[in-house]
Amino acid sequence: MANAYKQAGVDIEAGYEAVSRMKKHVQTTMRKEVLGGLGGFGGMFDLSKFALEEPVLVSGTDGVGTKLMLAFMADKHDTIGIDAVAMCVNDIVVQGAEPLFFLDYIACGKAEPSKIENIVKGISEGCRQAGCALIGGETAEMPGMYSTEEYDLAGFTVGIVDKKKIVTGENIEAGHVLIGLASSGIHSNGYSLVRKVLLEDGELSLDRIYGRLELPLGEELLKPTKIYVKPILELLKKYEVYGMAHITGGGFIENIPRMLPEEIGAEIELGSWEIQPIFSLLQEVGKLEEKEMFNIFNMGIGMVVAVKEEDAKDVVRLLEEQGETARIIGRTVQGAGVTFNGGTAL
């Protein structure tokens, strides 16, 4: 039977075209340490030029979750790849690691070359923001597993850090200052609840602007996750950072304690930073309690850094010079967990 594979739902020619289209985007991410080109069985990266006493490789892998469903609904696929990169590289930079390279995995029901190109275009943009090379990936066409409009997206990154410079959080003490770096919005966590609250129960339209939002709801929800790699690496060159937390699923409540010793807690000052209107809209439409919001979403802070009190103002200044919005949002205390002081945040 001629074209048997195509009749089974797998279009090899479309796959070849997708690879051809993505090459120009991938090329923009290359670093001098990358060996070989796109299309090999494995990606290669030369570590011989890194002048580190005890080099340690740090790896991370993650996906975008159900934020993908918003991309399907809006038929917008050119930024979702930034989210995939951000979720991985932000996780390893909190340990002091410089991301070196990234690999992606795209699984789809139907390989549409233009859509695949847009996804990889976003991945490449994320890699450029993080300074890492896109050295490989897999695009799997799986008819019957996914509908023709659906795909899943995941990524994997590897970074490097000198062993003595790994940021562990183990030396954090009571009295250290917590500095928050602003998020771009919801980032890539909590979208199952977002869809239920705003789209299913609230029946809001992706095309309309609600409340204090400055963009249509769909554009607001698809804002890419902020990548903090370059400002954090710059910070690590100049100041001692005792701990860092990437605020992802579990919000403040789960993620800040991940960087703290067992006997140390965090005291957060509500009102010390601006919380974006999208979170107010979510709480209002979903009638969600404030504590639940902080247990699910980043609430306007995508990264938290712990430093000495005497360095805090200078650290904020450096981060602002790097283009970040940074605020002192609290401090570490004797105890455990995360507590909140001040008035209502939303």
UniProtKB/Swiss-Prot annotation:
The gene is purM. It is an enzyme of class 6 (ligase). InterPro entries: PurM-like_C_dom, PurM-like_C_sf, PurM-like_N, PurM-like_N_sf, PurM_cligase. Pathway: Purine metabolism; IMP biosynthesis via de novo pathway; 5-amino-1-(5-phospho-D-ribosyl)imidazole from N(2)-formyl-N(1)-(5-phospho-D-ribosyl)glycinamide: step 2/2. One of its GO terms (molecular function) is phosphoribosylamine-glycine ligase activity. The lineage of its organism: Bacteria, Bacillati, Bacillota, Bacilli, Bacillales. The keyword tRNA-binding does not apply. The keyword Hydrolase does not apply. GO terms for cellular component: cytosol. It comes from Bacillus cereus (strain AH187). It catalyses: 2-formamido-N(1)-(5-O-phospho-beta-D-ribosyl)acetamidine + ATP = 5-amino-1-(5-phospho-beta-D-ribosyl)imidazole + ADP + phosphate + H(+). NCBIfam families: purM. Its EC number is 6.3.3.1. GO terms for biological process: 'de novo' IMP biosynthetic process; adenine biosynthetic process. This is Phosphoribosylformylglycinamidine cyclo-ligase. Keywords: ATP-binding, Cytoplasm, Ligase, Nucleotide-binding, Purine biosynthesis. Belongs to the AIR synthase family. It is found in: Cytoplasm.
